[in-house]
Amino acid sequence: LHLKVCQFAQVLLNNGVQKGDRVCIYMGMIPELAIAVLACARIGAIHSVIFGGFSAQSIADRLDDAKAEYIITCDGAYRGAKDIPLKGVIDDALIGNKTIKRVIVCTRTRTAVSMLKGRDVWWEDEIKKVETQGLELVAPVEMDAEDPLFILYTSGSTGKPKGVVHSVAGYMVYTNYTFVNVFQYQPNDIFFCTGDVGWITGHSYIVYGPLSAGGTSLMFEGVPTFPDAGRFWDIVDKFKVNTLYTAPTAIRSLMGFGLGPIKDHDLSSLKILGTVGEPINEEAWHWYDEHIGKKRCPIVDTWWQTETGGILISNMAGITLGKPGWATYPLPGVKAILVDDKGNEITEKEDGLYRGNLCITQPWPATIRTTYGDHERC
């Protein structure tokens, strides 16, 4: 991985990318995506990964907001039985664009694509140039702790997408801390987060968290029900996965297929299960516990979001007790209270429970630093 990251870092340098430049990454869930992310970090470029399902207009909006000058993409990506024409979507997004200097295209599906002379280059050709030049080791660029590491745009469900900025040191310190402690990572564990690097879950718990701990991170391309509903369990069995971190929506979807897709797979390598992205209902929690964890794997129910950078509220596997449907308590160092709509701390129960708005009262290392180009929205 180190060699491949260095090689692609040199590709970026050869194509004019410098410290502080914004690089848009629009790729499928393949190793080259993680390599591109880490290569940007190595030379101090600010990566902005865009989820592979976004439309050309959504991409154009994000390119414009980030003032991006470089794009890394693929000819296509696989999603279920479909081939997604990523390069074609990028071409549409760039109609009228005046800022993009270079588009680097990685081969994945061998989909026919158009290549604009002077702008578009093939990943593989650029790697061959680096190998020929013998420039395969690139020293990491010195960075300030508060320099931006990446911009990640929220989905825009509450208006114009906002570019959440996370910093170099604080973000990586916190993703490492939460990965090691929440999942009780042990050397040689195989960690399988089923998320997408286009979202914060993939940034934090596919790329930066596991790799900063020297862990093995397993990436998944496609959907959990293709070619059949046993896809996750086949991966767990084949690669002897130790920790599985997935979304309640995926669990509920797989529940609908019954136990047939599970029965022919050996899940005994699993030690820890996790959920992310939304609350998990008790029925799904118990199904996950009984049929996937065989009632011997702690389930960590994690609460966090793009702006927090990493997990804030969760039980810690085998250390603190979990409860079906509850994220339980803030992690050590995280200070959380409930407040009413006027900001007053809630100290009395309502119908046996404390109810209010969650407020984190003290900063943590991965706190959002700003909203790119619009600090007032932060």
Language-model segment annotations:
Residues 27-28, 48-64, 76-85, 170, ...:
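ATP-dependent adenylate-forming carboxylate-activation enzymes
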Residues 104-105, 111, 116-153, 160, ...:
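Conserved pre-ATP/AMP-binding loop-to-beta segment of ANL
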Residues 329-333, 344-378:
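Conserved ATP/PPi-binding loop(s) of AMP-dependent carboxylate-activating enzymes
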Residues 170-190, 200-243, 257-259:
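Conserved AMP-binding/adenylation subdomain of ANL enzymes
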Residues 22, 28-56, 66-71, 189-190, ...:
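A short helix-loop-beta submotif of the ANL/AMP-binding
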Residues 1-38, 55-60, 115, 119-125, ...:
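Conserved AMP-binding/adenylate-forming core of the ANL superfamily
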Residues 127, 212-215, 242-246, 255-324, ...:
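Gly/Ser/Thr-rich phosphate-binding loop
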Residues 14, 38, 42-128, 247-248:
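Structural core segment of the AMP-binding/adenylate-forming
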